[in-house]
């Protein structure tokens, strides 16, 4: 699914993300990393990034079922490519607990620190 910004914002709000991070910043970041597409899959050096949040297989999710228990989010990376973004959001909440928060996604600093009016719904 390719979401529109206000669709994405509404779903994020339904899952309490507005209490974690300002939604315009988050939606802007998501747009710049995945185009708000659940099917975005990117090879990034030796890692692969999945879904609307571009969650990395570098410890956050697992490529193989037998590695799921050792991943931070306890999920197969391929699950981030389906149309249900509930599990993506739950994993993103864990990423946002990192000291760098939204800074985990480089696009945030580059594109989403100011002039956020276009990302409001």
From Swiss-Prot:
Q: In which tissues is it expressed?
A: Mammary gland specific. Secreted in milk.
Q: Where is the C-type lysozyme domain?
A: 1-121
Give an example GO biological process: lactose biosynthetic process
Subcellular location per the Swiss-Prot or TrEMBL entry: Secreted
Q: Does the keyword Calcium apply?
A: yes
Q: Which residues bind Ca(2+)?
A: 79, 82, 84, 87-88
Q: Cystine bridges: which residues? A: 6-121, 28-112, 61-77, 73-91
A GO CC annotation given for this chain: extracellular region
Q: Which SMART domains does this entry report, sorted A to Z? A: LYZ1
Listed GO MF terms? calcium ion binding; lactose synthase activity; lysozyme activity
Give the matching Pfam families: Lys
Q: Which residues are glycosylated?
A: 44
Give the UniProt keywords, A-Z. Calcium, Disulfide bond, Glycoprotein, Lactose biosynthesis, Metal-binding, Milk protein, Secreted
Tell me if Metal-binding is a UniProt keyword of this record: yes
Family, according to the entry, reads as follows:
Belongs to the glycosyl hydrolase 22 family.
Assembly information from the UniProt record:
Lactose synthase (LS) is a heterodimer of a catalytic component, beta1,4-galactosyltransferase (beta4Gal-T1) and a regulatory component, alpha-lactalbumin (LA).
Q: Please explain the role this protein plays, according to its UniProt record.
A: Regulatory subunit of lactose synthase, changes the substrate specificity of galactosyltransferase in the mammary gland making glucose a good acceptor substrate for this enzyme. This enables LS to synthesize lactose, the major carbohydrate component of milk. In other tissues, galactosyltransferase transfers galactose onto the N-acetylglucosamine of the oligosaccharide chains in glycoproteins.
Q: What protein name does the entry list?
A: Alpha-lactalbumin
This protein's encoding gene: LALBA
């Amino acid at each position: 699914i390719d979401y529109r910004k206000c669709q994405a914002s509404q779903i994020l709000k339904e899952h309490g993300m507005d209490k974690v991070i300002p939604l315009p910043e988050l939606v802007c970041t998501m747009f710049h990393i995945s185009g708000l597409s659940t099917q975005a899959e990117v090879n990034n050096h030796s890692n692969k990034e999945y879904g609307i949040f571009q969650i990395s297989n570098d410890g956050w999710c697992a490529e193989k079922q037998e590695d799921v228990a050792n991943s931070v989010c306890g999920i197969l990376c391929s699950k981030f490519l389906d149309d249900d973004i509930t599990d993506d959001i739950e994993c993103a909440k864990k990423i946002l607990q990192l000291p760098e928060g939204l800074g985990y996604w480089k696009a945030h600093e580059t594109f989403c620190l100011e002039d956020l009016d276009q990302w409001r719904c």
